[in-house]
């Protein structure tokens, strides 16, 4: 949307969620050609860049600096720099701080484009065996008890497929809470997606 002749462009670059071979040629070339890469965790992303011999300068853009850092990045874009945004894994802007930068870019008239690729949300959905035509994405449930209960309660009458991200150490608790709200509903547990030990377990919330 918009963008002036002098402005640079923001590239949202999807990176692998586990298997490095899932990166696209277009993303590799873009990461090599842009002036700057904004990464959620530069210590994590340097491994990816080194693997593909990408020498582009990196800067950190994460949940704790997103508002102020987005302003800095927008200024650099307005000065003509092309910037690529990458997340720790998967597609920027989905359950990560990327949406703030995208919003500020649109407000400033900066052109934003997305380079598609790996996305845990879609990967899990299409191999789950659950209905794919209509779905609801909740990302990670809040850790705050009150907020968490509000969201769980709101799902009680949800008829669409529900996709939730969860960390291994909280998985049992979350499955128990979902069972209390949704009953013995069909569910699929996807682990280690795209990796050597990927597993997909289909059952019900009551049985699992």
Annotated model-derived regions:
Residues 8-10, 81-84, 161:
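Loop/turn-to-beta-strand initiation segments
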Residues 7, 161, 165-208:
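A contiguous loop/helix-start segment that scaffolds small-molecule binding in enzyme catalytic cores
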Residues 31-37, 109-113, 161-162:
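Short active-site oxyanion
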Residues 100-158:
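Class I SAM-dependent methyltransferase SAM-binding "motif I" and its flanking Rossmann-like core
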Residues 17-20, 88-92, 168-170, 195:
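Short glycine-rich anion-binding loops that position phosphate/pyrophosphate groups of nucleotides
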Residues 61-67, 141-144:
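Conserved helicase motor
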Residues 70-119:
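Glycine/small-residue-rich loop that forms an oxyanion/phosphate-binding "nest" at active or ligand-binding sites
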Residues 3-64:
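Glycine-rich, flexible N-terminal cofactor/catalytic loop recognition
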